[in-house]
Regions:
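Short, structured coil/loop segments at alpha-helix boundaries
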Residues: 3-7, 11, 37, 84, ...
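Basic, amphipathic alpha-helix used for nucleic-acid engagement in HTH/winged-helix/SANT-Myb modules
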Residues: 1-4, 56
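Cytosolic juxtamembrane regions of integral membrane proteins
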Residues: 29-69
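Hydrophobic alpha-helical bundles in membrane proteins
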Residues: 54-164
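Non-transmembrane, interaction-prone segments in cytosolic or luminal domains
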Residues: 2, 20, 24-26, 40, ...
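Short, non-transmembrane cytosolic segments of multipass membrane proteins
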Residues: 3-35
């Protein structure tokens, strides 16, 4: 006999999956492939509003634009290759790309300080790198369901806020 899923048990499963560190997109794609869990997959999709996905897409374009300018300012062949590598991660909306972008900005600051550059180029490189870091923090605060300290955000009714 098949167990009937209730709204509470579906939400509980979603929360447990999110608490384990999986993204909603990952859960949704995994469940959509299986026949038994399609109801749960649709439930996950309800928690990811379309406007949130669209905002994330536009934010990706801004980060890609900053990334190209950052690579052009540094004039380093390896940095330009890394920029193209990151472009594809950001284009796919993979959260891993944002982590690499954060590290890329830190490396660019270090690169600016340890190379012999004129003062103006040094200042521009540091400013673009800081802008990239602040962009990552902005993304983390606005478009994810976790705070900087790693706690899951909740709304006024003590429900989890489900954002990818």
């Amino acid at each position: 006999m098949k167990k009937k899923e209730t709204k509470y048990s579906l939400e509980k499963e979603i929360r447990e999956a999110l608490a384990s560190g999986r993204s909603q997109k990952s859960i949704y794609n995994t469940l959509k492939d299986g026949n038994d869990d399609s109801v749960l997959a649709d439930k996950v999709a309800e928690y990811l509003p379309l406007e949130v996905r669209n905002k994330t897409k536009y934010y990706n374009y801004i980060i890609i634009f900053l990334l190209v300018i950052n690579a052009a300012l540094s004039m380093n062949f390896l940095v330009i290759i890394l920029a193209f590598f990151l472009f594809f991660y950001l284009k796919e909306g993979n959260g891993f790309g944002y982590r690499i972008m954060f590290l890329f900005s830190l490396l660019n600051i270090m690169y600016a300080f340890y190379t012999d550059k004129t003062g103006l180029v040094l200042v521009k490189t540091v400013l673009w790198s800081l802008l990239g870091i602040s962009g990552i923090l902005f993304y983390k605060l606005v478009f994810t369901n976790k705070t900087i300290s790693g706690k899951v955000k909740k709304d006024k009714n003590d429900n989890y806020i489900f954002l990818d």
